[in-house]
């Protein structure tokens, strides 16, 4: 994706130079407009949402783009100026979350992913997935998804990956697909467990499921906040207690997730560099990175990935 974006962006820059239009303006003119979403591309992919104009405008305003252009023009007009000044601009839409089996199968193998969750009587959780972390923080991300769905502490959730003897089938870690696909499978599996726990809570509280509402870590009777069962209590009851007729013990679930579409995060990056005319030494003066990746499960991990990508580019 990086190489493809670089090629496209260089082509746009060359076009802007040839027709005498500012590089930011030519991009703005050719963006998909917000009111055009969902937008189907010439290749048949449907981009669900986006606001590319707002992203670009935010970046340009943050760095005072017009001021930078004036400074650049002044330096170019002054032969005695010891430095050259470059302004790099890149806007992109990334295709991630491969992918729908109907269009992304490899040798007949679909690119779905799966998650198996087992809940202990103590409220501890083991989640097994077919992906493998390479420094992206999978254990933290998957644990946070489960914690958010079930109201159990993330510190009590163990994530196991990469053991093909134990883990459910998955298409692996590549193409920025772990969270969109395996993460979604994790959420679906957790919701299956939550649905069963709700039935147990309704049985214990002697009310209908429709009379219950979820509040952080418990099911409580609507209008009666003192009548509730916590998820941790339900974990124990599911193994040892009085269950509804015909219900099996335990809180376990497996989910397979075949995404209906890819996901299309987008961004706008701007870099200002100064180059010493005599030595060729290059110094990055300013870098502004804007990404819209949708729901942020762990903002620190996202920021770390952006920092890592920028470091690679600098290197």
Each predicted region: which residue ranges?
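Cofactor-binding beta-sheet edge motifs in enzyme active sites
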Residues: 1-54, 61, 67-315
